[in-house]
């Protein structure tokens, strides 16, 4: 007679790439919280209206909180959420080309005001508005641009190697 192999519980990992904190939580299938960790990534304001943070530091903090909650656990699914718009401009190797820009950033406001023809008014913190600014203000870096990612999608790409987003973020990119 062969005894069944013991199975480990199937667990779920939630990862929130927020604008102030990065949080990871592990749940069991009944919704009980088994582990929770959080970390902070400093935000920079190098000029009036600019709000940035280091995308590589964001990745390091995200990886650290995931390690803390998942160590010794069998994670079977991962869900990501993030802090709205903004943009992380990366090259083909997912290397950030500059500091990441948070959605509260206003540097592209002049571009938004110039485009009065739009039926849906964009706002300065949307990826589309930020792309216009990036191409005009940092053309050398913009020539190496391969992907414009939302914050959670940058972390997802680093976790999985897959560049993707969801319909809600894509529709709000501007």
Q: Where in this protein do the model-derived segments appear?
A:
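N-terminal glycine/serine-rich phosphate-binding loop of ATP-dependent small-molecule kinases
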Residues: 1-99, 144
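Carbohydrate-associated surface elements
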Residues: 105
């Amino acid at each position: 007679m062969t005894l069944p192999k013991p199975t480990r519980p199937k667990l779920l990992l939630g990862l929130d790439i927020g604008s102030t904190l990065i949080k990871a939580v592990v749940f069991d299938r009944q919704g009980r919280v088994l582990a929770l960790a959080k970390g902070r990534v400093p935000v920079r304001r190098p000029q009036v209206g600019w709000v940035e943070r280091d995308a590589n530091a964001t990745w390091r903090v995200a990886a650290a909180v995931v390690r803390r909650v998942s160590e010794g656990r069998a994670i079977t699914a991962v869900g990501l959420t993030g802090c709205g718009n903004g943009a992380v401009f990366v090259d083909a190797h997912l290397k950030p080309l500059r500091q990441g820009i948070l959605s509260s950033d206003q540097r592209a406001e002049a571009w938004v005001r110039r485009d009065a023809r739009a039926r849906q008014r964009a706002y300065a913190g949307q990826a589309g508005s930020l792309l216009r600014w990036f191409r005009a203000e940092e053309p050398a870096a913009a020539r190496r641009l391969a992907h414009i990612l939302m914050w959670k999608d940058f972390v997802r790409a680093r976790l999985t190697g897959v560049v993707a987003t969801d319909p809600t973020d894509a529709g709000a990119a501007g």
